[in-house]
C-alpha cells in the first residue's frame, strides 16, 4: 500500500504542471552547439532501469566504461521508474540527458525542459531507423529534440508453471476475474502498472472487445470511452495485489510473492529467464501498447559537450546491439541486428518484434485537442483519476 500511495503522490505533484499539456506553442529559442568541444568531465543522465549498464549487473553488458575512458566524461545515472518521475526530475534540473518515452517527451518539449539538438553534430544520425527519425514524440514542427534510443512492446509476463501448456492469449487474465489453468483464481496474483498511462492498456483492451465504443487510439478517448476504461480499471483493482513501477521489485514479486501474470517489459522477462525462473511472455490478441524512447538534452545542460558525445555513443551499433539483447527490445539503428559488432542477430531482432512496429500503439501524451475526434480527455485527468482507481475510488 505504501509503495503505490507514494507513486500516487508523485503523480499528484505532476498536476502542478498539467496545464502544459493543453497546448504547445512551438519550439523555444535555444542556442544550439555548432561544434562539439572538449568534454566537461561528466554527464548526468536520467534513465530507465537497465538502460545504461557498466557491467555491474552482468559483466558482459557494459557500454559505459569504454566511453568514459575515451572521452573523460564520467557517466552518472539516476534511474526513474515512471515517465512522471522522469518529468519531475527534469523539472528539478541538474541533469544533462533523459531517456524519455513518448508519454514524457512531448511534456518536456512543451515545458521547455529539453532543447533542440543539432543532428549535424551526431555523425551516426544517418544510421537511425527511418521510421524513428521524424517520429512525432520527439519531432515538433520539423525540429528534433533528441536521438532515438530503443523501442519495444509492453508484454504480458506469466508464470509457466501456472499456465502449463496453455499460455495466455488475452490480456483478460489481468483484467477479468477468472480461474487460471492451475484451477486457482487470478485475484491477488496479478499486477498492473503504477502509472496513469496504464489507462491506455485498458483502452487497448476495449478497442478489441468493445468495438462499438469506436476507440481509434488508446490515447485519444472521449468522455464515454474514458469512463468505460476507468470502469475496467476499477474491476481490475479488485484483482491486483500490487501496482508495480520498480522493475526489480516486480521481479522479486514473481519469484517470492506468488505473482503469476502482469504487464511488463522484456527486461524483466529476460532477467528472470536468465535466473532459470519459470516465466515467459506474449503479445496477446488485443495487441499491446509500447514505448519508443528518445535521448533528450536538458535545456540547461551543464555538460553539453559530454551530452553530445554520449548521444553519438548511444547510436553506436555495438551498443545498440548489446542493449537490444539485454533489454529484449529493438535497436534504433537497424544495422545493430546484422553487422556483427555486438551480441544481437537478425533472428534475435525478429524475435524482439523488429517487424511489428506498425502493430504497437506507442506511448504518447493524451491531449484535449486530439486527431481522431472533436475533444479528448487530457492527461491531467488521467493522472487524478488513476490515483482514485488505485485508492479504490
Segments from the language model and where they lie:
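Mature extracytoplasmic/periplasmic domains
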Residues: 298-363
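Bacterial N-terminal signal peptides
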Residues: 11-25
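Conserved C-terminal helix/tail region of periplasmic/extracytoplasmic solute-binding proteins
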Residues: 359-393
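A bilobed periplasmic-binding-protein/Venus flytrap-type ligand-binding module shared by bacterial periplasmic
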Residues: 157-162, 204-207, 291-303, 322
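A ligand-binding cleft/hinge motif common to bilobed small-molecule-binding domains
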Residues: 104-107, 263-278
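Periplasmic-binding protein-like
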Residues: 127, 227-236, 275-296, 345
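Extracytoplasmic ligand-binding site segments that recognize negatively charged/polar headgroups
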Residues: 48, 52-59, 99-249
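Early extracytoplasmic/lumenal segment of secretory-pathway proteins
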Residues: 30-108
Amino acid at each position: 500500500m505504501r509503495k503505490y500511495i507514494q507513486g500516487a503522490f508523485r503523480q499528484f505533484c505532476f498536476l502542478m504542471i498539467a496545464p502544459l499539456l493543453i497546448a504547445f506553442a512551438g519550439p523555444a529559442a535555444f542556442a544550439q552547439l555548432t561544434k562539439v568541444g572538449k568534454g566537461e568531465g561528466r554527464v548526468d543522465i536520467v534513465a530507465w532501469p537497465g538502460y545504461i549498464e557498466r557491467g555491474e549487473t552482468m559483466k558482459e553488458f557494459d557500454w559505459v566504461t569504454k566511453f568514459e575512458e575515451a572521452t573523460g566524461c564520467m557517466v552518472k545515472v539516476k534511474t526513474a521508474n515512471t515517465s512522471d518521475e522522469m518529468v519531475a526530475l527534469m523539472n528539478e534540473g541538474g541533469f544533462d540527458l533523459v531517456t524519455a518515452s513518448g508519454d514524457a517527451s512531448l511534456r518536456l518539449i512543451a515545458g521547455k525542459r529539453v532543447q533542440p539538438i543539432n543532428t549535424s553534430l551526431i555523425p551516426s544520425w544517418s544510421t537511425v531507423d527511418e521510421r524513428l527519425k521524424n517520429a512525432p514524440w520527439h519531432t515538433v514542427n520539423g525540429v528534433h529534440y533528441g536521438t532515438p534510443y530503443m523501442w519495444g512492446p509492453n508484454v504480458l509476463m506469466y508464470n509457466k508453471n501456472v499456465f502449463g501448456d496453455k499460455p495466455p492469449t488475452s490480456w483478460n487474465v489481468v483484467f477479468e476475474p477468472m480461474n487460471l489453468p492451475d484451477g486457482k483464481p487470478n485475484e491477488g496474483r496479478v499486477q498492473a502498472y503504477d502509472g496513469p498511462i496504464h489507462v491506455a492498456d485498458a483502452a487497448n483492451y476495449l478497442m478489441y472487445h468493445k468495438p462499438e465504443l469506436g476507440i481509434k487510439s488508446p490515447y485519444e478517448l472521449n468522455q464515454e470511452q474514458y469512463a468505460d476504461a476507468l470502469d475496467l480499471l476499477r474491476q481490475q483493482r479488485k484483482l491486483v495485489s500490487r501496482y508495480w513501477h520498480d522493475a526489480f521489485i516486480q521481479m522479486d514479486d514473481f519469484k517470492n510473492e506468488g505473482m503469476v501474470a502482469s504487464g511488463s517489459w522484456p527486461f524483466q522477462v529476460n532477467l528472470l529467464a536468465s535466473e532459470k525462473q519459470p516465466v515467459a511472455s506474449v503479445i496477446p490478441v488485443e495487441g499491446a501498447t509500447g514505448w519508443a524512447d528518445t535521448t533528450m538534452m536538458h535545456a540547461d545542460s551543464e555538460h553539453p559537450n559530454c551530452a553530445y558525445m554520449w548521444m553519438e555513443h548511444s547510436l553506436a551499433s555495438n551498443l545498440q546491439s548489446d542493449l537490444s539483447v539485454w533489454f529484449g527490445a529493438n535497436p534504433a539503428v537497424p544495422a545493430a541486428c546484422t553487422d556483427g559488432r555486438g551480441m544481437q542477430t537478425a533472428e534475435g531482432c525478429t524475435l524482439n518484434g523488429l517487424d511489428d512496429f506498425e502493430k504497437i500503439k506507442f506511448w504518447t501524451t493524451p491531449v484535449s485537442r486530439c486527431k481522431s475526434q472533436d475533444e479528448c480527455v487530457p492527461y491531467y485527468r488521467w493522472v487524478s483519476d488513476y490515483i482514485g482507481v488505485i485508492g479504490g475510488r
